[in-house]
Design a protein with these regions (language model features):
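Transmembrane alpha-helix boundary signature
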Residues: 97-112
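Hydrophobic core segments of alpha-helical transmembrane domains in multi-pass membrane transport
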Residues: 38-44, 60-61, 65, 92-99, ...
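C-terminal ends of transmembrane helices
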Residues: 67-80, 127-137, 203-207
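A glycine-rich, hydrophobic loop/mini-helix early in the fold
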Residues: 60, 64-101
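Cytoplasmic-side transmembrane-helix entry/capping segments in multi-pass membrane proteins
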Residues: 78-91, 112-118, 142-145
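C-terminal transmembrane helix-loop-helix hairpin of multi-pass membrane proteins
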Residues: 21, 143-212
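Structural signature of hydrophobic alpha-helical transmembrane segments
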Residues: 50-66, 86, 110-121, 191
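Intrinsically disordered, low-complexity non-transmembrane regions of multi-pass membrane transporters
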Residues: 2-24, 208-212
């Protein structure tokens, strides 16, 4: 009896460690933006400000988490021939839900993000995790994978949005940091997105290398 209890505790600890590893992989080791370089369209297109980056990241996180859970639950019932269309239907359902919620409760952010919200449906991060992970793993593992990837994506977009807003307008989350007449318009425009992203990727990889 005692041995069985110890074995169960050991299994629980191992499962928890595995789930935490999956979670942190998405945030750091396999960060979708800074490491895998996925989702570049919303990354470059929505990060003109910190609030836009945060909003887009959280919307994508909700879709990632929800889609991973549902697809993992249904993986044994979806025929292999139609799995991609089925995944897209599941993802599109949650994207529509996010779109309706944002339109109702944060209309200014909804208007600012515009077409990028429905484009979450074809975001390669969301569909990629559904195909590569959720369709092959348990619900709990898929949940942690979706959460980790979503948080990693949110972190990247918020950092990029903050950097661009700070350098472009002297503000972060609309709070004045630098003098009022400060601002480099380049960083609010598309070329500034590429420059800021390149520097953040370099810094992120340098920190990872130093840690290793």
């Amino acid at each position: 009896m005692k041995q069985q209890l110890l074995k169960q505790i050991k299994n629980i600890i191992m499962a928890a460690n595995s789930n935490l590893k999956t979670l942190f992989n998405g945030i750091i080791k396999e960060n979708p933006v800074f490491v895998l370089l996925l989702g570049m369209c919303p990354t470059l297109g929505t990060t003109s400000s910190a609030i836009n980056g945060l909003g887009m990241g959280l919307a994508t996180t909700f879709v990632l988490l929800s889609a991973n859970i549902v697809i993992s639950l249904l993986k044994n019932f979806i025929p292999d021939k139609v799995r991609i269309p089925a995944f897209i239907v599941v993802i599109a359902t949650f994207v529509t839900l996010v779109e309706m919620i944002m339109q109702a409760y944060v209309p200014a952010l909804y208007e600012s993000l515009g077409l990028f919200i429905p484009l979450i449906v074809v975001n390669c991060i969301v569909l990629g995790r559904a195909e590569a992970f959720a369709a092959k793993n348990t619900v709990f593992k898929s949940m942690f994978d979706g959460l980790g990837m979503g948080l990693g994506f949110t972190m990247a977009l918020t950092l990029l949005g903050s950097a661009r807003e700070l350098l472009g307008t002297g503000k972060v989350f609309s709070l004045m940091i630098f003098p009022e007449n400060y601002g480099m318009l380049l960083f609010v425009l598309a070329p500034g997105a590429f420059i800021a992203l390149a520097y953040l990727i370099a810094i992120f990889n340098k920190l990872k290398t130093s840690k290793n």
